[in-house]
């Protein structure tokens, strides 16, 4: 708002270091992303995604933390639309990248786990199922981003009662 901008212009900040240091976020997350050196086929990208999922699980285990939600974003390469056949067969949404080139819209999805975990097997299975569900097998992959949401330490997760569904 204008009042904050005017105060800032005059060198007065209403937010002090005390407020900044006392801030505690409501939730935490870890994110890992890769821009691939060249366009990957879905088969090759699948291997990279599995490695990223296993790495995320090992990071959680190392930090004694758990997650119950995974978010995967797959960015496609402009080469996916470079030849005439690809442009005519692709029926999805097309966006423009930072360089003004046409590129297929990224794929994005979320997988919710039944309970908080740091199990490499459970996380990998969920991420691979999500990958298979959201990715277009006819396009070339250029960017991959995996985020673990709702990250808490193991002790906090053990103390938090799980919700029960009554039918």
Predicted regions and their residues:
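Basic, low-complexity intrinsically disordered segments
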Residues: 1-167
